[in-house]
Amino acid sequence: DKTADYPTGCPDNEYLLSAQNCSCTMDSEGKIQLVTEDIRNGNGRAIKSKLWSPNRVDKIDAPVNAIFWIMKDPTIPPVVKLKGAALASVMGATLATKTSTAERVAAGTDLNALRIVPYANPFRTYPLVNDYEKFKKLVEEKNVACYIVNTGDFMGTKVKPADTLGILETIVEGKASFEKWGNFDDIEIMYDWEGKTADFKPDLNNAEYKAALKSAMQNRVDAVKGFAEKKEGYDKLPDEALAAVQKLVDALS
């Protein structure tokens, strides 16, 4: 687990078994304390005891029935559900995130800048359509559900680990209640979950928010077009992929 999400003194850190890339300091009592934030060292990691989670199992006798695209797009609510195999797969192909401290990047790179990393795999050495078709098949033929989970912030409000864990548990336990989101035909939204820390309800009547969301979706349209144009079309996706994200932009017009 990344330790930067759990500040020094956080009760969750009582369950750490080992840590690396973390620094330490001496407190007023002369005791050595672990510094979990990325202050001196970057990309702190730890092995955490399974006892950290009160709701845990050692084995799951069930097939994979859901895909979660984990993003850090500030225009997307903490969780939405995608309908349709093409949309589900292309949103993975246009996965928006921020540069992780685990990555080696050029000097001067803005770590807070949003960028698209198809399927969160910067190391792919084959055409992007291969992954697109595989994920599409899971949804289309295996009836796998697809969600986007935003683990960054939503329009300035931090989505905390308690929110993400609560969202996952609510869905896994079959307690999730999704409903149609605005004018989107293929996106549903859930407003409540276990451990919710703030009001994350998006206001599509807010012109500023709607424009930001439309811009984020347009970025995905541009990305899909770019796949077809760059590297002599090596990463071109089927036309249905472009149509699926263009439909989202049109719904915000």
Where is each model-derived feature located?
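Conserved NTP phosphate-binding and transfer environment spanning the P-loop NTPase/kinase superfamily
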Residues: D38-S253
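Conserved nucleotide-sensing/catalytic segment adjacent to the nucleotide-binding pocket
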Residues: D1-L51
